[in-house]
């Protein structure tokens, strides 16, 4: 087949497609002539360009991968979530102080508080030359039957002092107290009747010595006072019998069961501050008459002392101290505040005798030459008698074995209490420029604690809580549980669905770095469901927080609570709620079940846990992922991790007393929070997640006195009420409604939408249907056949065209009849 034949064949293919296609415009352009053909061609090209633009918009929308969030309220059976509760106080104060690392952290915090208080300016009141003597209540220590005022005494006593010294807040070093006796040995009496008035002057007496407390009292209505010589008479205002006795024989006491005339029954309890509901009366031989108000007692505030001051104040004269020493074979050890140039000898620490009276430090010996023993007796100066049979003695003492001289020290609180914690460091009293190993260690530890330059109490307490976390992290698992609360002490009562639950078996305990022992309800129970909504059918707990065991670093009393899925790790420090003591804290919860689409529509992950996820036993969530990423970064950058998170793989967390690693942790945490992209973290949302929204409300608890459960035996009902409000809390966690909100993501524009819109645009602008697409396919197939046939010698059979043959026959007949269509 030649070129002309190929050309003719292709022309026939095009003509055949143009004549028979169902698409709009193409047949019209072919059969038309002149300007009509150009008009139809222009119209076809315009429609083709419009279709191309619409097709581009359709494809662009399809590639955006838009999603639709369907919201539906479903009424189905709901699983009750896991509820984790923790005490706001992480560890018991008494147990925590027995461990060295925690004790050091607490004492450093207390010392920082002492220093911050020392910077507060206070004006000292001038003392009057003619001050009056008044009684004052304070603490005393007993020595051979004599009582002496002492800030850290253990005997409650009453002393005599000057009036301006007894003001609250005056804690001068030159305060004078004398005539001190046990408080129970003093009596409260009537001194005299105020001149020209119906008022009484009271005083305190020990044997024959009485001191006016400058308190004026008045009898209640309708009682009236009168004086009959040396006697004091009491009678109603109306005419009635008078009761008269010597004024000195009336005593101020507590009373009860008072009638409307003011006559009462004397109470056996002589402490005027213990009984809240008792009255105050003046009594004589069982005849009591009520007076207004309660007797106010003067009390001296115990001053806060620095740690080394507390040790120094225990003994009057002699005690053992650590000091910098210059030790030689010829002269032995000599205490020095300025080190000798021979650093090998002067940069050592030894133990010395320190005389508080003349501030002399001598003699001194190396620490191995001292021995902790038991002595038979010690005097008030602090020196003790050396005993050859220490096992039979009871007083703890520290002895210099070369000279057999001993001083009294505190006994060890636990087996791991070191001598370093019970002996004063002389550089705490008079800082030195030397840098002995002990001093260096102490300075590094103080630097790591981060209290330097911080004066605000809130900032100090926040730093102290962080130091506690670091200190506790160094303990073993057994030691952590030893100082933590247990389930039976913390959770007093529990009910779920209106039925009592088993505290021992239904709660799972774990150690949280911030809140210590926490207890989770719901993990063991699996499919735990509610029968009804409302507080009565949810989880109800009565907890006992034990405020008396709170650490000084704890700011608030109460419970920390978080609601989460049963397979997730709870994070009470960031995702929790606080419930105070003395209230019923109600937490109404609602469930949102979320189903997200993965890529390319969304950015969720079906299984996000990797080998770097530090909460290995829990399900994946974004909070755990972020903490894992930060912990990984800290472990690789600083060589250790943050103890607020579990360790990363085989690495360990940073120690509390290393200032350089603590500083590294601090700096890298700032980097992690400000620019997390540098860490390479990719924490995506899980594709399936249950989210619990919580609403909070509270009311006073208990409402009235009456329930004595949980209170010490023998406690009165009104005291039990106050006891529970101070030490306990009621927690309620419940579903507000037994339905949940389902949020389901679905693709907004899929393949079906693409094909539908694409076909619609083709039909609108081009009149194209599926048949037209088939015609185009057939056209290209015919062209392909024509090209193949051109290489063969066999001639391709001619195709018949209805419209072409009709037009040719019409032209022939018209020419035959004499018509010329072209003219």
UniProtKB/Swiss-Prot annotation:
InterPro entries linked: Deg-1, ENaC, ENaC_CS
Record's keyword annotation contains Methyltransferase: no
Residues annotated as glycosylated: 228, 326, 347, 415, 486, 527, 546
Biological process according to GO: cellular response to pH; positive regulation of dopamine secretion; sodium ion transmembrane transport
PROSITE patterns (UniProt xref): ASC (PS01206)
Main location per the UniProt record: membrane
Motif GAS motif per UniProt: ranges: 767-769
GO function terms (MF aspect): ligand-gated sodium channel activity; pH-gated monoatomic ion channel activity
Membrane-related topology note: Multi-pass membrane protein
One Pfam family named in its UniProt record: ASC
Disulfide cross-links: 86-518, 494-501, 604-687, 625-683, 629-681, 638-664
Transmembrane segment boundaries: 39-59, 768-788
Annotated GO CC locations: dendrite; plasma membrane; postsynaptic membrane
Cellular compartments annotated: Cell membrane; Postsynaptic cell membrane; Cell projection, Dendrite
Cytoplasmic compartment residues: 1-38, 789-795
UniProt keywords, alphabetically: Cell membrane, Cell projection, Disulfide bond, Glycoprotein, Ion channel, Ion transport, Membrane, Postsynaptic cell membrane, Sodium, Sodium channel, Sodium transport, Synapse, Transmembrane, Transmembrane helix, Transport
UniProt key word Glycoprotein: yes
Function: Forms voltage-independent, pH-gated trimeric sodium channels that act as postsynaptic excitatory receptors in the nervous system, playing a crucial role in regulating synaptic plasticity, learning, and memory. Promotes synaptic vesicle fusion to positively regulate the release of dopamine at dopaminergic neuron synapses. Displays high selectivity for sodium ions but can also permit the permeation of other cations.
Domains: entry comment: The second transmembrane domain (TM2) is a discontinuous alpha-helix disrupted by the GAS motif, which forms the selectivity filter by adopting an extended, belt-like conformation aligned approximately parallel to the membrane plane. This peptide belt encircles the waist of the channel and divides TM2 into two discontinuous helical segments. The distal helical segment of TM2 interacts with the cytoplasmic portion of the first transmembrane domain (TM1) from a neighboring subunit, contributing to the structural and functional integrity of the channel.
Family, per entry: Belongs to the amiloride-sensitive sodium channel (TC 1.A.6) family.
Subunit-structure text: Homotrimer. Heterotrimer; with other ASIC proteins producing channel with different properties.
Protein name: Degenerin-like protein asic-1
Gene name of the encoded protein: asic-1
